[in-house]
Every structure is written in structure tokens, then in C-alpha cells.
């Protein structure tokens, strides 16, 4: 069994923002795996299905970014799932736009959604797929993460979202080491 959580902020006003690339990846996975993400449970929009005989839960926490851990904590405790089968997908300002980085575990890197998850799960030992959104040119991080991609960036991000969805599938199918060697550039 796997829980895949894509981080973002709920609401139409946040759709397409840099901070919501995690939601975009869940939408891509929803299509690829045929799992509808529409039920409200665990403070999230969720969908449940199967991939290669394994149960898969897709989550889009509706708590707002800084409280993402509340949603994931509820789901992990309900299903009693080992943390190595929890995959978190989120934006990373320290990676250039469209770059993907997969890690087996690690710190939050200053990402508040990840801070919340690590704090409430009391562990850094779960896989994550990070998608680069680049650094703000003017230094205003809040405006940057809540801002939209330029037309040029959008093309790169659309491809990155598809690659990130493929990376998650690769983790489930072939393990994290395989996915890291295939997708970390």
C-alpha cells in the first residue's frame, strides 16, 4: 500500500501557483492511474485505487500548506502504513524550474508544509519527490511561491509534472533507488 500526498493550497485562487505543483502531480497521477480524487477525508481531497495489485491513496491536503502534516498524519495513522510507503510531492525553491529531485529521506529544506509533516509524523524517513520552482528574482519568497509561472516556465513545469508523476510510479514499481538513478539529474 502507498499513500502519495501532493502539497498545495486549496481554493481556485491558488490553482496554477508555484506552491501547488504537488497538487498538479496528484492530478497527473489521477489520470495515469485512473484514480478519481474527489472524496473529502483526512482533511484532504482523496482518491483510492490500485496499481499492480497494491492499494494506492492519492491525497491533496485541504489544510493549507503550513498544516499539511495534519492531513498526512491522519491518513498514515488510519492505514497504519510504514513511512517508506508514504511519498510526498512538493515544490522546491532551491531547484531550478522544472528540475526533479527524489530523496529517500531528509530535512524539510525550510519548506513549511514539510516542516509540518516531519513534526507530526515525528520522522524525516519517508520518500519525497521535489519539483524545482526556482528562486525569486526580487527575494520576496511569499510572492514567488504564491505567484504563477510565466508562459515559458509553464511549458517546463507541465513536462516536470508529468515526469514527477512517472517518478512516483517508478518508485512504486521498481523502488526508490531505481527512480533516483532514472530521474535525479
Curated annotation (Swiss-Prot):
PROSITE patterns attached to this UniProt entry: PEPT_TRNA_HYDROL_1
Active-site residues from the entry: 19 (proton acceptor)
Cited CDD domains: PTH
Reactions it catalyzes: an N-acyl-L-alpha-aminoacyl-tRNA + H2O = an N-acyl-L-amino acid + a tRNA + H(+)
Example of a GO biological process term: protein quality control for misfolded or incompletely synthesized proteins
EC number in record: 3.1.1.29
Domain of life per record: Bacteria
Gene Ontology molecular functions: peptidyl-tRNA hydrolase activity; tRNA binding
Record keywords, A-Z: Cytoplasm, Hydrolase, RNA-binding, tRNA-binding
Site (Stabilizes the basic form of H active site to accept a proton): 91
Gene Ontology CC annotation, any one: cytoplasm
InterPro entries assigned: Pept_tRNA_hydro, Pept_tRNA_hydro_CS, Pept_tRNA_hydro_sf
Main location: cytoplasm
Quaternary organization: Monomer.
PANTHER family in alphabetical order: PEPTIDYL-TRNA HYDROLASE
Family under the similarity heading: Belongs to the PTH family.
Protein name according to UniProt: Peptidyl-tRNA hydrolase
Annotated organism of origin: Caldanaerobacter subterraneus subsp. tengcongensis (strain DSM 15242 / JCM 11007 / NBRC 100824 / MB4)
Amino acid at each position: 500500500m502507498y499513500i502519495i500526498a501532493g502539497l498545495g493550497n486549496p481554493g481556485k485562487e491558488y490553482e496554477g501557483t508555484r506552491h501547488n505543483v504537488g497538487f498538479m502531480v496528484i492530478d497527473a497521477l489521477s489520470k495515469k492511474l485512473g484514480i478519481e480524487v474527489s472524496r473529502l477525508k483526512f482533511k484532504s481531497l482523496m482518491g483510492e485505487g490500485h496499481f499492480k495489485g497494491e492499494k494506492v491513496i492519492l491525497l491533496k491536503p485541504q489544510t493549507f500548506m503550513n498544516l499539511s502534516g495534519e492531513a498526512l498524519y491522519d491518513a498514515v495513522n488510519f492505514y497504519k502504513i510504514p513511512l517508506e510507503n508514504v511519498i510526498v510531492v512538493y515544490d522546491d525553491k532551491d531547484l531550478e524550474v522544472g528540475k526533479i529531485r527524489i530523496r529517500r529521506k531528509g530535512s524539510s529544506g525550510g519548506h513549511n508544509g514539510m516542516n509540518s509533516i516531519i513534526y507530526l509524523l515525528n520522522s524525516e524517513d519517508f520518500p519525497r519527490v521535489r519539483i524545482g520552482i526556482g528562486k525569486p528574482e526580487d527575494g520576496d519568497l511569499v510572492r514567488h511561491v504564491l505567484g504563477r509561472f510565466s508562459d515559458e516556465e509553464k511549458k517546463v513545469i507541465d513536462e516536470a509534472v508529468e515526469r514527477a508523476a512517472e517518478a512516483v510510479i517508478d518508485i512504486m514499481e521498481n523502488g526508490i533507488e531505481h527512480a533516483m538513478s532514472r530521474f535525479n539529474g
